[in-house]
Amino acid sequence: MGIDPGAANLGFGVVRIEGSRMVALDGGVVETSPELPIERRIERIHRELSELIEWHEPKAMALEDLYFGKNVHSAMAVGRASGAAMLAAAQRGVRCFTYTPQAIKKAVCGSGAAGKDQVQRMVGTLLGLPEPPTPDHAADALAVAICHGGYAPREAVAANGTPAVGGLAG
């Protein structure tokens, strides 16, 4: 399960690895109104992600790492949404991993400097979708899931006691 964290629009995407390819199972956005108090928005994110986790039973949750720009208020809201997602995962025994935006773009497009449109198109191509996924928050979450899926075999090796090649952020 991939997560594109945000307090107003949190993207989620669920993929399954089938042999050498990935298949999209679900994707969408948890929307909250900016008119609601932040605690109500975070509660809704937690509740809806908890339901999605119970439904899909993911083996892992991968989140886009917080990018700290100039807007501290926005960064705090994204951090709170990430925390709600991680709590929902932890309460159901699902391990969480984080990836930088550059690592996600590189995993999906081959370049950490890829634009949003390029990521959206590549997500559609990699998942065999007839069109690029929308909205963009859902596409970004699917990109996070694809990124983690590319690293998942390394995690399995590391879990068996053999050092992983490369590494997972976590």
Role assignments for model-derived ranges:
Residues 1-170:
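Phosphate- and other anionic-substrate recognition elements at nucleic-acid/protein interfaces
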